Amino acid sequence: MIPGEIITPSGEIELNAGRDTVKLLVANTGDRPIQVGSHFHFYEVNYALIFDRELALGMRLDIPAGTAVRFEPGDEKEVSLVPLVGSRRVYGFNGRVNGEINAEGRGG
């Protein structure tokens, strides 16, 4: 082994295997690009992004950790979301939840 070497199993690694997903059509109605990171609570993203926010409560993008999706002005694209896991407590971001999200996705 080389110091710092990462040894992974052979084959493909499926991200978020077995998790429920939601697909949403998202439009950037603003005049600036908007970039959303992999673990940002999608319900609380910039208000220039128009989509069904209630479906995004308790969800994040279904993309690899450390990556992001960029929405250029006027862009409209479909994204896939997965539920936040763990304690399902959401604090910060834009301050819209600041507490627990129950199993149905509603603030608790």
Swiss-Prot record:
Transmembrane segments: none annotated. One of its GO terms (molecular function) is urease activity. GO terms for biological process: urea catabolic process. It comes from the Bacteria. Its EC number is 3.5.1.5. It catalyses: urea + 2 H2O + H(+) = hydrogencarbonate + 2 NH4(+). One of its GO terms (cellular component) is urease complex. Its main location: cytoplasm. Keywords: Cytoplasm, Hydrolase. CDD domains: Urease_beta. Pathway: Nitrogen metabolism; urea degradation; CO(2) and NH(3) from urea (urease route): step 1/1. It is found in: Cytoplasm. Belongs to the urease beta subunit family. Heterotrimer of UreA (gamma), UreB (beta) and UreC (alpha) subunits. Three heterotrimers associate to form the active enzyme. This is Urease subunit beta. It comes from Nostoc sp. (strain PCC 7120 / SAG 25.82 / UTEX 2576). The gene is ureB.
